[in-house]
Each structure stands twice: as C-alpha cells, then as structure tokens.
C-alpha cells in the first residue's frame, strides 16, 4: 500500500496497477479503500487457479497496451509465488523439480516478470513483485530461488525487526540493486558501502534510520554522515 501511495503521489503521470493473486478478500477490500489513484485487480483465494492466471494475463496485456501508447506503467504483484503455484497446479509435463515444481510451470510467470522494460519508442513497464520465503514449503523456496536472479533489485524484509516493531522492517545488508553504481553518485556509493560495513557491528538499524530521517536527500545525508559517524 505504501509503495502504491508513494508512486501515485510522486509520479502522478504513471499508471499504477496492483495485482493481487490468491489473496484474502479482506486484504483486497482494505487496499481498494486506502489506495487512491491506482487500479486494483484481484483474484481471491476462493477462486480457482484458472481465474488467478486469467487475471494476471489481463493485467499484463493491458499494461503492454498502455506502454505502447507511451505510458509509464508500474505493476505491483502480490505475489509471484502464488502466481507460479497456480500455473504449477494446472501444468502436467511429466517432469518434476525439487519441491514438486513442474519446470513448465515457470514459463509463463517468467514471461510475466520478464515483460518489464524501458522501450525506446513508447513508455516503460516496471514490475515489483513479492515472493514468499520461510513458509516451510520447499516449493516456495524453489520458486524464490528461480526468480531471485531475474530481478534488478531485491528488498529483503526482516522478521526480527518487525517483531521489534521497527519499521520499515528491511534487512538492509541482504537488500540491494544491480548496477547501483549507475543509480548513485560516487559519494553516495561510497557512503552506502561504509554503512553496510558498520551495520550490525558499530551501528544499529535504529541509528541508521535516525540519520536518514534527519535528512531530506541522499546528498544531504552524504554531507552530514561523516560528522555523525565520527561522534
């Protein structure tokens, strides 16, 4: 919800689509009521696998048409795990990977996730998808590993921080982006490396969040961080 609200507020010209697969009805209702400016497409857990797949296909094709028309589109998918489970339930190739995953069941979810791109003559499509981990299901672990290497950014949540009511509950050391040197200035990249090294040894997550909350931009954080770190 926070991501969708931030996108609609910070990038009012973008098209934000929230796709909820195999979700609880009360969660769907909550998101529809609290997120304005975004389209919510859903297939709740009381619907069958074919309905889950149909909803995902409709969203992807609609997003592609918007991109062709020059729009910048963001799909927030919750979750790629449940979508792959749906395909796994209706696929029977006769082969099986660890955890009971049919390798053919990965084809369409990969196409969905791989549709994200920045086009030269049109708009762009960004896909931010959640993946379930630590569920006790070997199938979920295999799905996560299959998609882990496909993304350009990975944000890992921390159960420990959530239990301590420290939000956002992000495992910073395990999170990161590919090609971050293209996203950050040399000074920002250097500070990022320093903070990762200090985190957990000489600096707590609370201290880091306090530093971030006291600044409005990355550039300001870079300027003031040296002073704070030397205290």
Question: Model-derived features: where do they sit?
Answer:
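P-loop NTPase catalytic core
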Residues: 1-231
């Amino acid at each position: 919800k926070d991501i969708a609200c931030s996108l609609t507020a910070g990038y009012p010209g973008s098209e934000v689509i929230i796709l909820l697969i195999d979700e609880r009805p009360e969660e769907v209702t909550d998101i529809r009521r609290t997120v304005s400016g975004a389209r919510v497409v859903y297939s709740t857990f009381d619907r069958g696998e074919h309905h889950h797949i149909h909803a995902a296909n409709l969203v992807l094709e609609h997003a592609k048409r918007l991109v062709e028309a020059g729009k910048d589109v963001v799909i927030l998918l919750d979750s790629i795990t449940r979508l792959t489970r749906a395909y796994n339930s209706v696929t029977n190739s006769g082969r099986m990977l660890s955890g009971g995953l049919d390798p053919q069941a990965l084809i369409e979810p990969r196409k969905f996730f791989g549709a994200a791109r920045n086009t030269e003559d049109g708009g762009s499509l960004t896909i931010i998808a959640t993946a379930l981990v630590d569920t006790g299901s070997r199938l979920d672990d295999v799905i996560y590993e299959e998609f882990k290497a496909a993304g350009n950014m990975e944000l890992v949540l921390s159960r420990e921080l959530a239990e301590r009511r420290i939000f956002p509950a992000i495992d910073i050391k395990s999170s990161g982006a590919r090609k971050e040197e293209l996203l950050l200035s040399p000074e920002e990249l250097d500070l990022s490396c320093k903070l990762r090294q200090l985190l957990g040894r000489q600096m707590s997550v609370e201290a880091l969040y306090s530093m971030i909350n006291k600044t409005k931009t990355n550039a300001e954080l870079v300027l003031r961080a040296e002073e704070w770190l030397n205290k």
